[in-house]
């Protein structure tokens, strides 16, 4: 009954998490001051903090029900397990700032990927004893949020943004944010994100706004912020400049328009081609390549701009012009093309802007003023045709810039905006990576890092929006300058000093800052900067910044530049780049293709643990990840496999308690071989997994844990443990309990829910209200090796090889399951022979031999082996012979089998001999590798000789 109530309770919580519902503390507006870290924010989970685990008398159900994930998560959070401990650690705190998703967002697979990867790292470092801060938050998403609310107003029939006015519109946006802004973080909780939600940040929190203002003013004081006219991406539908990240490119088929550019004072003309005829009205030159003999005689002359009323522009030579493209003559419009703008700077050309903010032609368009840019395109071409200036049109495919939010074609134009001079800051970012202060994983992204920062352009940081950080600049009527200040009072003080009387009103710049400006301060502003808070001292610089490679420059590079500028330190030690999540065919997911996967649908069907494991295992840093539902199903089955192992162990581990540390060498030495083996392999896996996670080989760590559980623990040790009796029972139970707990601890960062649930059932029988696997120490120690027994590992690997050989013979000969074989085992290794003899029950269970008929001898001569017995060479010094009576197969078939085996070994020998005869290998390979190759060759030669002898014996018996 209790379990049924629990599952219903968990399902209710899952629904709340999916919708983003539940109680949430209202975030104050910018007008509400508060301390730098703010009050603890409450959980979005509308569930009481009960222990969602089975009682001592309740057995594990037959199947794992992942609907318990939600209630388990609520319990973790209520226990404060996501908050950094106060413990000291030699390596200091582990800090990972979460990339803040847009407050308007809904969880997608990109979010799911970073949540899984960052949560794995956070859980691992907590388990290693480091105070761990995974700091979450959301971004105000200026364009997206403003656009969303504007559309909501329109759908309601409410007054528009401009009709409401700035203050009332912002009140409406804050109301939307308070009501809906918690949805994305609630959905992240469904994935098990163990972020410290008590420190959750929003980029428009008052303390964050103070940091943004401080940063802007400091940059201005150093002369790094300026107001000027430069080329920007302009979104006519949004009426603002937008960042490169908010521009998407589509391959579209358009036209290339060929026309005559008449040479002034003659009948001669230059043939010119353009894809945007409307921009002719903004031309300020025509350029040709200085090496182009066709037009050399025209350089230095003037030509007449079509449909301009006779305006003339110069014909200039410039190396940028491609002789082979179009006609080889390039119309130059510095006001509306990025490349033309650069030519204009080189050639000192004037800039003419022909567009209004809404995409219509301004007064510089002459007779076309007021027309939409695309209507103008048609009209001016028709007029040019009528004037006899048209040569031809031809189809032309090009990459067209599209506004991600507005949906329309982006217009490059020169606009007066606020810019940050990034030259010096960019050089510091280059040095930080080159000097090793920052490590980029994978290393191949370093080349792109250097290339981008060494060629960085000044950063346009102003946006013509209302929602965001309003630029801290004030203007006074009748005064040509402006006042950049931390507050209006400070601006007034500056104005007085400039001779502006107090009766003159100050007007604040209406623009807001680029969202990337505030998020560029994220690693240090979230922990108290510009104040020297205890958190700033403890958690900055961050240890790792984990994010997608697609925002390496838009966000990561800017954080590095800002961190170095304002704190003098690199904001993080490591930049870990993950790839994009693609579909099972490795194609990019898109709505048009119909292959988009909603992670919440996957969680509903398979559970968060299965999705997390599918996203991160097999992942290589920086590589895109194909995701199929078959893979998720496999990992759901992995959850079930762990669950079933726990059900098998449950009666054996009654009263078990958490291990108080790793098994030490003395205890290990007293165990039987099988137990020494599984403990040694558990320790080996723990150390390898820890090393992989420390080195950010996250997928490799998950794979190792998976393979240890499946290939060593479940498939081998659990099976042989069923044969333990007498004095071995106690050692077996100790090894089972210990090895399974190691499994749970190694898998926990990847699959936190199922592992926590099982750990509580099997290892917290006392019902300690605060004990948690999440808070348990990682099995691998820092700075100390775990106990291991190399002899036990060697013996067990050989024993496993024997079992596999016996199974292979059965499979090849089609021996019925009920038939027990009686092999003769020739084993030259006395210790291995003793193990085989002592563990005949286990051998019988796993390979279906009759223990009473098994013979173990040191040499073939020591046994009475029939000449026609089937032989299999397991390894050097280990062979198996099965009598024909067990196989019921004829000699001819056995000769054929041995012949194929001998042929394969002969090929191996030829390959090894060829390698050793190759001077390039023998002379250049490490001596150890050469010696190992010689040893392999000797072993293969011996195996071939044994097989040849067996073949000869069989031939003689025919």
Residue ranges and their predicted role:
Residues 1-25:
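N-terminal chloroplast transit peptides
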Residues 4, 60-62, 110, 137-140, ...:
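Conserved short loop/turn motifs at secondary-structure junctions
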Residues 17, 28-48, 52-54:
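N-terminal mitochondrial targeting presequences
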Residues 44-291, 316, 333-365, 384, ...:
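N-terminal, positively charged nucleic-acid-binding surface of large information/translation enzymes
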Residues 46-49, 258, 451-517, 521, ...:
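Feature 926 captures the class I aminoacyl-tRNA synthetase adenylation module centered on the KMSKS loop
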Residues 90-98, 120, 156-160, 185-192, ...:
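Active-site-adjacent bridging/hinge elements
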Residues 110-123, 129-130, 138-139, 208-211, ...:
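Structured ligand/cofactor/substrate-binding pocket environments in proteins
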Residues 123-131, 152-163, 186, 190-195, ...:
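Secondary-structure transition/capping motifs at alpha-helix termini
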């Amino acid at each position: 009954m209790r379990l049924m109530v629990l599952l219903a309770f968990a399902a209710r919580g899952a629904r709340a998490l999916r919708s983003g519902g539940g109680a949430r503390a209202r975030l104050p507006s910018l007008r509400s001051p508060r301390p730098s870290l703010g009050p603890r924010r409450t959980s979005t989970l509308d569930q009481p903090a009960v222990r969602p685990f089975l009682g001592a008398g309740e057995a594990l159900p037959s199947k794992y029900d992942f609907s318990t994930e939600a209630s388990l998560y609520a319990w973790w959070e209520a226990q404060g397990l996501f908050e950094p401990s106060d413990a000291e650690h030699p390596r200091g705190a582990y800090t990972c700032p979460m990339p803040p998703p847009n407050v308007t967002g809904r969880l997608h697979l990109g979010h799911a990927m970073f949540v899984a990867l960052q949560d794995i790292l956070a859980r691992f470092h907590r388990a290693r004893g480091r105070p761990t801060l995974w700091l979450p938050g959301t971004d105000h998403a200026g364009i997206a949020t403003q656009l969303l609310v504007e559309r909501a107003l329109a759908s309601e029939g409410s007054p528009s943004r401009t009709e409401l006015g700035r203050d009332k519109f912002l009140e409406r946006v804050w109301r939307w944010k308070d009501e809906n802004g918690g949805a994305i973080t609630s959905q992240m909780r469904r994935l098990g994100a163990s972020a410290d939600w008590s420190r959750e940040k929003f980029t428009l929190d008052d303390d964050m706004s103070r940091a943004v203002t401080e940063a802007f003013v400091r940059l201005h004081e150093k002369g790094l912020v300026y107001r000027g006219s430069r080329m920007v991406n302009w979104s006519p539908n949004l009426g603002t400049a937008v960042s490169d990240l908010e521009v998407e490119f589509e391959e579209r088929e358009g036209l290339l328009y060929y026309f005559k550019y008449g040479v002034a004072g003659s009948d001669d003309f230059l043939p010119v081609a353009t894809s945007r005829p409307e921009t002719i009205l903004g031309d300020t030159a025509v350029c040709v390549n200085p090496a182009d003999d066709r037009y050399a005689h025209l350089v230095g002359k003037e030509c007449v701009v079509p449909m301009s009323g006779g305006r003339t522009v110069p014909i200039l030579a410039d190396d940028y012009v491609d002789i082979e493209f179009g006609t080889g003559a390039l119309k130059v419009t510095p006001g509306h093309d990025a490349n033309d703008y650069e030519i204009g700077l080189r050639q000192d050309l004037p800039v003419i802007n022909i567009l209004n903010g809404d995409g219509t032609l301004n007064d510089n368009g002459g007779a076309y003023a007021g027309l939409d840019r695309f209507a103008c395109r048609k009209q001016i071409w028709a007029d040019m045709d009528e004037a006899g200036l048209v040569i031809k049109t031809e189809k032309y495919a090009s990459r067209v810039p599209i506004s991600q939010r507005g949906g329309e074609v982006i217009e490059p134009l020169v606009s007066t905006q606020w810019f940050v001079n990034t030259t010096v800051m960019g050089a510091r970012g280059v040095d930080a990576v080159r000097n090793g202060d920052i490590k980029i994983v994978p290393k191949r992204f370093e080349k792109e890092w250097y290339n981008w920062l060494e060629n960085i352009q000044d950063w346009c940081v102003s946006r013509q929006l209302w929602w965001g950080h309003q630029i801290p600049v004030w203007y006074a009527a009748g005064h040509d300058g402006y006042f950049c200040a931390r507050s209006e009072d400070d601006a007034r003080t500056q104005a007085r000093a400039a001779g502006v009387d107090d009766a003159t009103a100050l007007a604040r710049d209406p623009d807001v800052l680029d969202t990337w400006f505030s998020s560029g301060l994220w690693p240090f502003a979230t922990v108290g900067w510009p104040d020297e808070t205890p958190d700033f001292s403890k958690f900055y610089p961050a240890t790792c910044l984990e994010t997608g490679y697609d925002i390496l420059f838009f966000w990561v590079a800017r954080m590095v530049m800002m961190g170095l500028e304002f704190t003098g330190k690199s904001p993080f030690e490591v930049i870990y780049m993950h790839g994009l999540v693609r579909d099972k065919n490795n194609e990019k997911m898109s709505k048009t293709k119909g292959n988009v996967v909603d992670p919440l649908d996957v969680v509903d069907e398979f559970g968060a643990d299965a999705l997390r494991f599918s996203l991160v295992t097999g992942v290589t840093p920086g590589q895109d990840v194909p995701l199929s539902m078959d893979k998720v199903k496999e990992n759901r089955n992995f959850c079930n496999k762990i669950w079933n192992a726990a059900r098998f162990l449950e009666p054996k581990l009654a009263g078990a308690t958490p291990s108080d540390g790793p098994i030490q060498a003395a205890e290990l030495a007293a165990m039987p071989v099988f137990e020494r083996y599984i403990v040694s392999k558990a320790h080996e896996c723990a150390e390898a997994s820890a090393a992989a996670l420390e080195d950010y080989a996250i997928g490799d760590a998950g794979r190792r844990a998976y393979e240890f559980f499946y290939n060593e623990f479940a498939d081998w040790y659990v099976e042989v443990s069923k044969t333990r009796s007498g004095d071995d029972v106690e050692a077996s139970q100790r090894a089972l309990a210990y090895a399974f707990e190691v499994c749970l601890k190694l898998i926990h960062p990847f699959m936190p829910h199922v592992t926590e649930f099982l750990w509580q059932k099997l290892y917290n029988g006392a019902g300690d209200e605060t004990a948690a696997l999440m808070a348990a120490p990682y099995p691998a120690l820092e700075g100390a090796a775990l106990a291991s027994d190399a002899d036990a590992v060697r013996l067990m690997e050989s024993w496993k090889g024997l079992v596999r050989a016996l199974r292979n013979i059965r499979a090849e000969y089609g021996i019925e399951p009920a038939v027990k074989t009686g092999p003769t085992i020739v084993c030259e290794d006395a210790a291995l022979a003793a193990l085989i003899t002592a563990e005949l029950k286990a051998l019988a269970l796993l390979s279906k031999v009759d223990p009473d008929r098994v013979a173990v001898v040191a040499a073939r001569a020591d046994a009475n082996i029939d000449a026609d017995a089937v032989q299999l060479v397991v390894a050097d010094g280990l062979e198996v012979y099965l009598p024909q009576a067990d196989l019921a197969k004829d000699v001819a078939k056995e000769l054929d089998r041995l012949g194929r085996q001998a042929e394969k070994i002969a090929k191996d020998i030829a390959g090894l001999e060829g390698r050793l005869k190759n001077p390039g290998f023998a002379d250049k390979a490490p001596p150890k590798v050469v010696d190992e190759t010689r040893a392999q060759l000797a072993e293969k030669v011996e195996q071939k000789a044994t097989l040849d002898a067996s073949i000869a014996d069989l031939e003689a018996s025919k």
